[in-house]
UniProtKB/Swiss-Prot annotation:
It holds the Pfam family Ribosomal_S14. Part of the 30S ribosomal subunit. Contacts proteins S3 and S10. It comes from Streptococcus pneumoniae serotype 4 (strain ATCC BAA-334 / TIGR4). GO terms for molecular function: rRNA binding; structural constituent of ribosome. This is Small ribosomal subunit protein uS14.
Length: 89
């Protein structure tokens, strides 16, 4: 389980990215790189990191499900992820 402060920091970054998305796109299209540099650092989407929605784990997160490999495996075994079954051939 990740620290709550790290999960909160990531959520805060996401809000800032959403808030400045249109302004960033307009500045980028106009080629105003000085204006871009005056925006907050956390307004850049490259500063975001995918985290597991269940555990907050930052590594090995499947984008399609938003879960880490560990949480995905546990939920899949319990049958709580629709359409996911254990492979057998």
């Amino acid at each position: 389980m990740a620290k709550k402060s790290m999960v909160a920091r990531e959520a805060k970054r996401q809000k800032i990215v959403d808030r400045y998305a249109e302004k960033r796109a307009a500045l980028k299209a106009a080629g105003d790189y000085e204006g871009l540099s005056k925006l907050p650092r956390n307004a850049s989407p490259t500063r975001l990191h995918n985290r597991c929605r269940v555990t907050g784990r930052p590594h090995s997160v499947y984008r399609k499900f938003g879960l880490s490999r560990i949480a995905f495996r546990e939920l899949a075994h319990k049958g709580q992820i629709p359409g996911v079954t254990k492979a057998s051939w």
